[in-house]
Amino acid sequence: MHSTQDDKPLLKVQQLCIANETGQTLLDDLNFELYPAQTLAMVGESGSGKSISALALLGLLPETLSVNGKVELENIDLLKLSQPQLQQLRGKRIAMIFQEPMTALNPLHKVEKIVGESLVLQGLSEAEAQQKVISLLHDVGNEDAQQILKCYPHQLSGGQRQRVMIAMALALEPEILIADEPTTALDVMLQTQILDLLKKLQQQRNMAMILISHDLNLVKRYADQVLVLNQGKVEEQGTISEIFDQPKTEYTENLLNHNFGQALVLEPAETLLRLENVTVKYPIKHGLFNQVKHYKVAAEAIDLSLMQGEALGIVGESGSGKSSLALAIARLIASEGDIIFQGNDLNQLNQKQLRPLRSDFQIVFQDPLSSLNPRMTVEQIIGEGLKLRSISKALITTKIEEVLSKVELSIDSKYQYPHQLSGGQRQRVALARALVLQPKLIILDEPTSALDRSTQRAMIQLLRRLQQQDQISYIFISHDLQVIKALCQKIMVMHQAKVVEYQATALLFNQPQTEYTQQLITASQYGASCN
């Protein structure tokens, strides 16, 4: 809570309204006050107006959107400032952690420049800026800060990129930090570490925070006030106890419902996929001639088997090798060992031999905005794979509309581009693109990470239904053990590139064999203590 001496709001939002060029209201009559050291959480379903509200505060909305109302930062109306005036405030007084770091971080710059650029502009020498960057990277949980310093964004894991984003936002010590899904790609233990850090910095700097999150477990533990948005309107707002203990609307009650149901009970079936001693390693290059000096092992000696119609959950901390293993299974990166899919060793096939099998295994990536072509409409994105088949345009259109309905997107969304969709909607487009090819195996890398609880529940129900109807198998990579528990029959726990536990879901939750697994389970439980 804000202290009594801070009786004046740092930020005051009055009657904020946002509409698009056709006059459609995207945000209607938003009002709130934010005090120093206070955390205000914005929650709501995907597309409810959370992110556009935050972008409006920073003057980052497209010019095609009209904005009305008042946004006062200590009597300065931000909506009346020019772009040069706003640029003077961004980073120094108000900073933002964006939802999708892969698209927010400059791909041409190394981490050292990405985080340190603003520090150099403030007058620090390059050496001083480098030391500050290393300190910031350590603060947000990067033990190997010196190595990360020299990496480009694409060389980092999703969680590492998100931590770089947080370090960049904290560099100039802003008075207000807007955190749009700041821990989406992080494992549950690191989520707690990052938000504990942000809470500590709040107290030290008297920093206010707007926390945009679909994770109500984190909201309950770290926020002071909650604002619930529904289709651009405020459904209700109040203290943590008011919203969580006495919700006034059915919409809020549905958001708070964290029961995803149970995974299907399966009959024995044929083995679809088998991994034997699979290892993934990346070359580390140094020197004038960029020679390979050594290798970083991302996944070591992995064995697993997956039946037709079965779902395997893979969990572990950020950088543990989960995504690298997924890319290796899909033959998108090289690996050693045997990957046997439908009787074929994928590692022994060349690209021509592999092509006929590609539609049978699909992958849904962690960061949908960077995996969807920005120049293509949703219809073109989903239909791209179908065009390689000898089927009519009419049938392609029918299949696209069917799969949009399956993932609960409107038929009209097929005319939109990725940037016009919310994070959750983009994730459903990515799933639709995979489903339309009717694969036997779908590898899902954090597919529900950007979704609110009610949309997560709908997605899990959809995946279960497809699993039952079409005998689709899943490899489901996630840091959210509650989601994995609701879908997967088996769970593999990875830690520092190795498998530390691999067993049936019920057995793993009831009798975890390692302390690391127990820590993951404890941290994922709804309402768990943050200590």
Briefly describe each language-model feature range.
Residues 151-156, 160, 417-421, 425:
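Conserved ABC ATPase signature
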Residues 219-221, 484-486:
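A short, surface-exposed alpha-helical micro-motif characterized by mixed small hydrophobic
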Residues 128-147, 394-412:
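Conserved ABC ATPase "signature" region
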Residues 66-77, 337-345:
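Conserved ABC transporter NBD signature motif
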Residues 234-238, 246, 499-503:
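ABC ATPase "signature
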